[in-house]
Amino acid sequence: GRLFKITACVPSQTRIRTQRELQNTYFTKLVPYENWFREQQRIQKMGGKIVKVELATGKQGINTGLA
């Protein structure tokens, strides 16, 4: 199947001294095509947004049968 490589940004609250500051956390993950919409909704529910979406080439899967 196809894989998307997504970069998303979600707000994470960190305590800095006494004040609370909103800080964005960026993460990258590979998402199978079938799970794409679910992942998108999950990120949006967290108040985040998807910054970048790339089509990941399927080259990682070549050695799967050798494990």
From Swiss-Prot:
Predominant place of localization: membrane
Pfam families assigned to the protein according to its UniProt record, in alphabetical order: CpcD
GO biological process: photosynthesis
Database matches in PROSITE patterns: CPCD_LIKE (PS51441)
Sequence ranges assigned to domain CpcD-like in this UniProt record: 1-56
One cellular component (GO) term of this entry: phycobilisome
Entry membrane topology: Peripheral membrane protein
InterPro entries linked to this entry: Allophyco_linker (IPR011134), Allophyco_linker_chain (IPR011064), CpcD-like_dom (IPR008213)
Keywords: Antenna complex, Membrane, Photosynthesis, Phycobilisome, Thylakoid
Localization in the cell: Cellular thylakoid membrane
General function of this protein: Rod linker protein, associated with allophycocyanin. Linker polypeptides determine the state of aggregation and the location of the disk-shaped phycobiliprotein units within the phycobilisome and modulate their spectroscopic properties in order to mediate a directed and optimal energy transfer.
UniProt record similarity statement: Belongs to the phycobilisome linker protein family.
Protein name: Phycobilisome 7.8 kDa linker polypeptide, allophycocyanin-associated, core
Organism of derivation: Mastigocladus laminosus
